């Protein structure tokens, strides 16, 4: 908490301490806009750049970011936040010469095809797996056992991704760190995360999320 205060990270007072009954909201789901009611109110008071919230077991991450043009806070889908993290991490690794020649980008079959374009941009093998993050975890294990590919990034549309190979499930804590790092990076360019997302669409093409 002291680190948060020092670094100008604001915690919603009403939701700061553990509350097994979740008395401040109907359903602690970061995919539900109602879960951000208190956070959005605080964000407007302190003029926050981004709003981040995880679910109770911290594997899914919900995101809002300010739109520079309108000043409004815009919500991200799981596809959007996943792609924003991927683009930032992969671009930084490429710039520093840290991308593997046999790198792999793993996604579930119901996730955005924008991932295909990003994988192509960074010369990564795009691998699609069945719905469920456990299948992404299985790919990591397969890579390690068979020395086929190096895992670069994996995500699913339901607000989950994994940066690194320390786990075999989605990890919202590390995703939060990655998005905060990305937010700081883009702020040096006078951009918010929402601005960066629009720039991604303009680069790769606009995508519409939908389930059939």
Give the role of each language-model region.
Residues 6-9, 123-125:
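Structural alpha-beta junctions
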Residues 44, 48-50, 54, 71-74, ...:
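Phosphate-binding and adjacent anionic-ligand microenvironments
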Residues 59-79, 115:
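Short Gly/Thr/Asp-enriched flexible loops that form oxyanion-binding sites at enzyme active sites
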Residues 10-62:
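N-terminal small/polar loop signature for handling phosphorylated ligands or for N-terminal nucleophile
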Residues 23-28, 67, 141-145:
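Short low-complexity, flexible loop/linker segments enriched in glycine and/or proline
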Residues 20, 77-89:
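Catalytic or ion-translocation cores adjacent to nucleophile or general acid/base/metal-coordination motifs
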Residues 1-5:
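Short, small-residue-biased leader/transition segments that mark boundaries at the very start
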Residues 35-39, 85, 135:
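Well-ordered alpha-helical segments embedded in enzymatic catalytic cores
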């Amino acid at each position: 908490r002291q680190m948060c205060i020092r670094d100008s990270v604001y915690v919603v007072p009403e939701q700061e301490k553990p509350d097994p009954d979740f008395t401040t909201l109907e359903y602690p789901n970061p995919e539900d806009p109602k879960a951000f009611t208190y956070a959005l109110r605080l964000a407007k008071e302190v003029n926050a750049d981004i709003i981040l919230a995880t679910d109770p077991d911290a594997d899914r991450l919900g995101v809002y970011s300010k739109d520079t043009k309108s000043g409004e806070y815009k919500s991200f889908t799981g596809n959007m936040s996943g792609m924003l993290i991927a683009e930032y991490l992969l671009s930084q690794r490429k710039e520093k010469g840290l991308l593997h020649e046999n790198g792999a980008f793993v996604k579930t079959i119901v996730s955005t095809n924008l991932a295909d374009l990003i994988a192509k941009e960074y010369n990564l093998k795009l691998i699609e797996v069945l719905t469920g993050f456990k299948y992404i975890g299985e790919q990591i294990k397969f890579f390690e056992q068979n020395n086929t590919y190096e895992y670069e990034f994996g995500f699913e549309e339901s607000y989950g991704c994994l940066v690194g190979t320390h786990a075999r499930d989605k990890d919202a804590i590390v995703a939060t760190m990655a998005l905060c790092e990305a937010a700081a990076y883009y702020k040096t360019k006078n951009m918010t995360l929402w601005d960066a997302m629009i720039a991604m669409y303009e680069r790769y093409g606009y995508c519409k999320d939908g389930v059939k």
